[in-house]
Design a protein with these regions (language model features):
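Acidic, proline/glycine-enriched N-terminal capping motif
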Residues: 1-73, 79, 322
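Short, conserved active-site entrance elements at the starts or edges of catalytic domains
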Residues: 201-224
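Short, surface-exposed ligand-recognition loops at beta-strand->loop->(often short) alpha-helix junctions
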Residues: 34-40, 122-128, 261-267
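Acidic, low-complexity central loop/insert segments
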Residues: 24-27, 31-32, 77-208
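Short hydrophobic/aromatic beta-strand micro-patches
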Residues: 34, 88, 172-174, 261-263, ...
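Short amphipathic beta-strand starts and helix->beta connectors
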Residues: 12-21, 64-75, 103-108, 149-159, ...
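Glycine-rich, small/acidic residue-mixed loop/short-helix segments
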Residues: 1, 71, 218, 223-240, ...
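Short, solvent-exposed amphipathic alpha-helical segments in soluble enzyme
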Residues: 47-53, 101-106, 136-137, 185-190, ...
Length: 330
């Protein structure tokens, strides 16, 4: 979630432009869990929804941690290193993920350890330029690939992030050094971005985050992230039976996350209606300087199609799968 994000003092429109046209930096409410031991990748491969065994040191992926009933416990970034696999997730999901791993360990030669870390996000088309100007000698190339780097005088783990709006990177820093890392990035052209601007960028990119747009009440097929978080070629893992059953039914679910063009600003939790009947609810709302009022939210399967007309708080709204293709007119 974005609980650590606050207003920066700058105008949200300026922050938005920085994230869309240049580079912006945010502090993310995430933490890490280290998994070590000789069978660490085998173990995680059997626990998470994506292919962990196929990753070499320096590579990574995103995955879902699920219950046996398919409930989403967390979105996890998996970073394979030479002697450890680092799992990055929301701070409030570290304990549930650790509990699930411990419960399924059953004698497997793996060990778990949490450690203090601050996680920063750097997004925008000039993010790479900022990093190089700040001292990073090279940038990770593949999505969720990573390596050690320096920003100014501070060591960081630098990750090419696939869960930020647009091109972006995530940096893992020691907590006592995080302010220095952030200040160095800002000194080399990154602008601080607060929640209001980031929400607009996330909604435009249809970039859902766990805790804000997704909870334990959701199934992976409802999030629009199945192709990102799931490998269809791997064997058994926790929650696999539910995924396979849904795939056998064509992936059909009763509700799914969609974008919405709104006729007026709204707030998260506001119901989506159609024909006087409830048809969903909003999860993230924003006023985009480019598009006006927009949102992400869940809609009933009868309104999955782009262009479906619904209402939010009695005001007409329209379902969107791609905001850029939908154009700038309401």
């Amino acid at each position: 979630m974005l609980r650590e994000l606050e207003t920066t003092g700058a105008a949200p429109d300026e922050e938005y432009r920085a994230g869309r046209e240049a580079a912006g930096v945010v502090t993310l409410g995430r933490g890490t869990l280290d998994v070590s031991g000789p069978k660490r990748q085998d173990f995680l491969h059997a626990m998470l929804s994506n292919d962990v065994n196929g990753r070499r040191p320096g590579e990574g992926c995103r995955a879902a941690s699920m219950s046996a009933k398919g409930s989403l416990l967390a979105f996890v970034r998996v970073l394979v290193d030479t002697s450890v696999v680092v799992l990055e997730t929301e701070k409030e999901r570290l304990e549930p993920v650790l509990h699930t791993l411990e419960r399924h360990k059953v004698g497997a030669p793996v060990r778990f350890a949490t450690r203090p870390v601050s996680v920063l996000g750097l997004l925008g088309p000039r993010a790479g330029e900022v990093l190089k100007a700040a001292g990073a000698s090279s940038l990770p190339e593949g999505m969720d690939s990573h390596h050690e780097a320096r920003v100014g005088e501070q060591p960081v783990r630098l990750v090419r992030a696939s869960d930020l709006p647009g091109d972006g990177f995530v940096l893992h820093a020691q907590p006592e050094q995080a302010d220095a890392v952030r200040q160095t990035l800002e000194a080399h052209g990154a602008a601080a971005i607060g929640r209001e601007a980031l929400d607009a960028l996330r909604v435009e990119a249809l970039c859902p985050w766990y805790g804000t747009d997704v909870t334990e009440d959701n199934l992976l097929h409802e999030t629009g992230l199945l192709n990102v978080l799931h490998s269809s070629s791997k064997g058994c893992y926790v929650g696999q039976e539910v995924i396979a059953r849904l795939e056998g039914r064509g992936g059909n679910v009763n509700k799914a996350l969609r974008g919405l063009r709104l006729g007026a600003p709204a707030t998260p939790g506001t119901p989506v209606t159609a024909g006087g009947k409830e048809a969903g609810w909003l999860t993230t709302c924003a006023v985009s300087p480019r598009l006006g009022p927009i949102a992400m939210g869940y809609v009933h399967r009868s309104h999955f199609a782009p262009g479906s007309e619904v209402e939010v708080a009695g005001v007409p709204a329209r379902v969107v799968l791609n905001f850029d293709e939908a154009g700038t007119s309401a």
